[in-house]
Design a protein with these regions (language model features):
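Short, surface-exposed loop/strand segments
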Residues: 1-69
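Residue-level detector of well-ordered alpha-helical segments, enriched
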Residues: 69-70, 120
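Activity-critical C-terminal alpha-helical subdomain
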Residues: 77-135
Length: 135
């Protein structure tokens, strides 16, 4: 049985990465990937402006799809305004721990077992231009 994975992405770069590199891998495992860029306003997409836009897109996907759907996110950590738990986590020095707590807070806020939030710790575009020997 196949599954569908909707990835709510920040912009065109993440969308292309999901389509061109992730989709073929997941398709081999019976998972169809559908990246969707965050709606920031009526008729506009891209750029992570606020949490409500992200939450609205996630909820729209979860409500309009069946049980065979999983939703995740692909947004940069430094562009995460007003996320649930962000203020409580601001004292955590380890950024990976901070991201994990914020992902958990998003999951708790939306409260649907089909949601697996993912926040990219380092700006995705910066990773594309770094030497692989540095990573």
């Amino acid at each position: 049985m196949s599954k569908r994975l909707y990835i709510v992405v920040e912009g065109q770069t993440e969308e292309e990465f999901a389509k061109d590199l992730m989709a073929p891998y997941f398709l081999d495992h019976g998972i169809y990937i559908y990246p969707t860029i965050i709606h920031t306003s009526r008729g506009h997409k891209g750029g992570f402006v606020n949490y409500e836009h992200l939450k609205n897109d996630i909820n729209r996907l979860l409500k309009s799809q069946g049980e065979d759907v999983v939703v995740t996110t692909f947004v940069d950590f430094f562009r995460c305004p007003e996320l649930p738990g962000a203020e409580d986590c601001s004292r955590i020095q380890n950024h990976a721990e901070r991201v994990a707590k914020i992902e958990k807070a998003i999951s708790d806020d939306i409260n649907d077992w089909r949601l697996y939030p993912y926040i990219q710790l380092h700006e995705f575009e910066a990773l594309l231009f770094s030497g692989s020997f540095l990573i």
